[in-house]
Amino acid sequence: MARHSPLYEEHAKAKAHFVDFAGWEMPLHYGSQIEEHHQVRQRAGIFDVSHMGVIDLEGEEATAFLRYLLANDVAKLSDVGRALYTCMLNPQGGVIDDLIVYRVAPTGYRLVVNAATRDKDIAWIKEKGAGYKVSISERPEMCILAVQGPQAIAAAKSIFDEALYAQLEALKPFHFISSPTRDLQIARTGYTGEDGLEIIVPASRATDLWARFVHQGVKPCGLGARDTLRLEAGLNLYGTDMDETTSPLISNLSWTVSWNDADRNFIGRRALEKQLDENVKERLIGLVMEEPGILRNHQKVWLTEDGEGIITSGGFSPTLGHAIALARVPVGEVEKATVERRGKKIPVKIIKPPFVRRGKKTF
């Protein structure tokens, strides 16, 4: 049986078109995926992402444990109220998941993990944390609402009291505020390439909060728009652009691996070092096809001199009005590429992602 978000009835009332996502019945769109995409790029939209997992860690060895568990270094989170993006790797250097970690207390952290991997993630984290003085608790009662777009912060003004709004208005990217009981957490983070907030609240408060944002004119948006927004922003999708068989070094995620402390032997470090010693063989690039047509996942890409690659994420860009894609290709200087469509080779432009930043074309 499919799992439902606590906001399922709200989505049904709004005439959502549902889709199965990792065993969850979630809104794909509420009538027009394209309109929802433009709503976020131009104004503000709200997403229910409560299918994602929330995991709290607490204990005197929580920091030491996460420095071992994660490829990025939580020692960078020098203050409570800061967050970072990281990969969690297996010993072979493959990506078990990508996630955000929040420092909620001097000895406390919160992880937000992907829906498709949440059960696997909690099992892995508990297994690896067994030798550390740390408590690990999944928080299935928490919901996550993402309010995204250039007007997202302004939309929150009438939702929260004056003092709280002043705090969130002053938030820098990857910073957050939370209540003393942690039953309200507001972070300046997102997955759309726009400014915005991600709000974690108990299910008992989520419906009211959702309704108040909608009343302010923030339009509900589904997973379809979320995917086209993240693709335009050049953001990876787990299971598509990387998985347990691919390392961050070939997934445009080298920047999420912290090498600063030579003594920090995080899981997967030796495998990544070996890849570097042997020279990384692949990379992710951006492709743009301005001719009519769609670039699709798993489609082959032919390069002028360095063989062929494969599209990992492809689709139509509503902002640009044509097809874009992320593709994994051999390392090397590549100036031209083609894809096949209806038996013909079609030229595609190679760019460095993102394709869109703050609603504007980047190339």
UniProtKB/Swiss-Prot annotation:
Pfam families: GCV_T, GCV_T_C. This is Aminomethyltransferase. The glycine cleavage system is composed of four proteins: P, T, L and H. Its EC number is 2.1.2.10. Disulfide bonds: none annotated. GO terms for biological process: glycine decarboxylation via glycine cleavage system. Keywords: Aminotransferase, Transferase.
